[in-house]
Amino acid sequence: ECREKFGKSFVYLGDEFYLLAEKQLPDASWYDGFPQIENGIGLSRSFIDEWQQIAAKTDVCNHSVDAVIPVGTSAYKILQPLLDNFNNKTGSKHSFIPVNNEFFGETINVTGLLVGKDILNAAQGMKRIILPAVVLNQDNLFLDDMSFDDFKKAFDGKVERAVNARELVMLLSR
């Protein structure tokens, strides 16, 4: 009714509502320019749209080591198929890894609330990890107060981070 009367909404459901209900995310136009993206509302749609646009232009990967990208368990279901298509197209074997949130509890399943220790536990034995930038704050700390530098020291491999889908595709392609 608000959309009909004013031409836009003022209430938006968080992405996790759609994911938990196993419903398709709304199109980007539904989010009215993403006014609440900093709260994670529309972040999945924005990421998917950007990913599809940039990945469509990528044919070959020159990577030497396949990467893992840690994500919340809710995001894994919608993101892994995108990466499977990318891998098939480019001949790579990258993967998203769903990380259980032991720190806050397993019902907390969004990527932005993952902590360094949980990510390290999920990525044991991996040689290359690309962290979503949303897991770090402006001081380069995870929510468990682990620093990015301490994470790099604890991880036995290459650590990179990506701010958005464009950066992620770029890192996966080299």
Residue ranges and their predicted role:
Residues 1-174:
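Auxiliary Fe-S-binding modules of radical SAM enzymes
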